[in-house]
UniProtKB/Swiss-Prot annotation:
GO terms for biological process: abscisic acid-activated signaling pathway; defense response. Keywords: Allergen, Pathogenesis-related protein, Plant defense. This is Major strawberry allergen Fra a 1-C. It comes from Fragaria ananassa. The keyword Methyltransferase does not apply. GO terms for cellular component: cytoplasm; nucleus. GO terms for molecular function: abscisic acid binding; protein phosphatase inhibitor activity; signaling receptor activity. Monomer. InterPro entries: Bet_v_I/MLP, Bet_v_I_allergen, Plant_def-hormone_signal, START-like_dom_sf.
């Protein structure tokens, strides 16, 4: 098994606490509302929403995939960090066992620095193709921009 790690960093002019509430704490409600073509619904299968929780995310009609399951490892509201693994679903190819994600939102003078790390755990000696990672980053970036736009259009929410 190989592990391929990819890091990404980008900025937002939305304050970290507000962004964390929308992007992490209420994503299961907000994303289906603002991007139903991407995510139809999210449901908790086990747990209370904290560490150890298993969620099923059902994708919308605009997606190439049907569903994924996430296992939450940590949510730190004080330090604005979140980690989980994609453990099941058709977004995992035959060559990927799981994908670990870590997100950290860092307060900056004019908003937030968002730092993400993705670790692809492959089966056997399979290598991850750069275009697979790039496509995932583009989808995540598009979804993030939708959330950011929603927060700008609704400044009184998530305070």
């Amino acid at each position: 098994m190989g592990v391929y790690t990819y890091e990404n960093e980008f900025t937002s002019d939305i304050p970290a606490p507000k962004l964390f509430k929308a992007f992490v704490l209420d994503a299961d409600n907000l994303i289906p509302k603002i991007a139903p073509q991407a995510v139809k619904c999210a449901e908790i299968l086990e747990g209370d929403g904290g560490p150890g929780t298993i969620k099923k995310i059902t994708f919308g009609e605009g997606s190439h995939y049907g569903y994924v399951k996430h296992k939450i490892h940590s949510i730190d509201k004080e330090n604005h960090t979140y980690s989980y693994s994609l453990i099941e679903g058709d977004a995992l190819s035959d060559n990927i066992e799981k994908i670990d994600y870590e997100t950290k939102l860092v307060s900056a003078p004019h908003g937030t620095i968002i730092k993400t790390t993705s670790k692809y755990h492959t089966k056997g000696d399979v290598e991850i193709k750069e275009e697979h990672v790039k496509a995932g980053k583009e989808k995540a970036s598009h979804l993030f921009k939708l959330i950011e736009g929603y927060l700008k259009d609704h400044p009184s929410e998530y305070n």
